[in-house]
Amino acid sequence: MRGTKFELDEQKASKLSGMSVDEVWNFINQKAKEADLIVVKNGEYHAKGNSKDQSNLAIFIFDELFEIDWFTKSVKTWEQFYDDEIVEDIIFILQSNMAETSK
């Protein structure tokens, strides 16, 4: 099973987004559904086990969440996994990309 999970500073996300905590999670969960992912719980999303898993996760992570300023400033931990093994630390990838673009 492929997926992603993260821990969010809910109060910070709420403040930066101008939404309530419930609205923040509803927004994120809707983005996951639009990327055809399974919402396991707030902050944990699984792919459906088909040929589009990797692309659906990439859409959710990089095309959706990565582009939301209040999200990237509020996320505490963020990992992508495969069969319950951590594959990538998304925060490390984001920081590396930011460092590259600022050169």
Q: In which residue ranges do the predicted regions lie?
A:
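Basic nucleic-acid-binding interfaces
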Residues: R2-L8, A13-K103
